[in-house]
Amino acid sequence: MTAISRPRVLIVFGGRSSEHEISCSTAAGILTAIDRTKWDVIPLGITRDGQWVRVADDPSALEFKDGKGQSVTAGSTRVALTPGEGNLVELTYEGDPDAPESRVVGVEDLGHVDIVFPLLHGPYGEDGTIQGLFEMAGVRYVGCGVTSSAVSMDKHLTKTVLAAAGIDVGHWELVTARQWEADASACMDRIERLGFPVFVKPC
C-alpha cells in the first residue's frame, strides 16, 4: 500500500481493439461508482495506437454522447510502469513524442501503484499480453492471469482445453482463413454438419 491511507488503483481503459469506445464507456461507469474514500484513483488511457497517457478524472468525458463513443487521445506526455517496482512515471517530450528526433525533457514520478483494474476489451487487453506486463512490473491486477487470459481469448483453444479436461462443450468446427480460401465449399460442408443456426466467433 502507498504511504497515503488509501491504496492506489490504476484504472486502465481504451486500447487497440475495435472495442475502444466501449472500454472508455466502461471506465466512465467505474470512475463514477468507485468509492473515493477507500481508493486513490488514477485513470490511465491507452490510445488506439497503443500510447499510454494520463487522462482527466472526468467520467462524463468518457461516456457515449448522442450515440457517439469517446476515444483516448495523446498529447506531449506518455505514461509507463517501471518493471519490477510498480511505479508509475509520466514522461514529457519536446515536440511530437512519436517523432524519431523527440527527446524526454521531464519525468514525473506518479508514485507506486497498488493494484491495476484493466477495463480493456479484445486483443492487447483480454489476451494475456497486458497481464504479462503487469506481472513483470510486479503489480497486482483484477481479473484472470496470463495463461487463462490467453487460452480464453482463443475460442478454439478454449474448447480444446475444456474438452481435454472432460468438460462437456458444444460441437464446433474451426475454419481457418487458409482453409476457406483453399476450398470454401468443403468448409461449408463441415459447418452444415453442425446444423443451423450456428454461432460464428472469430478467434
What name fits each language-model region?
Residues 2-13, 17-18, 24-25, 41, ...:
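Active-site nucleotide/adenylate-binding loops and adjacent lid/helix of ATP-dependent enzymes
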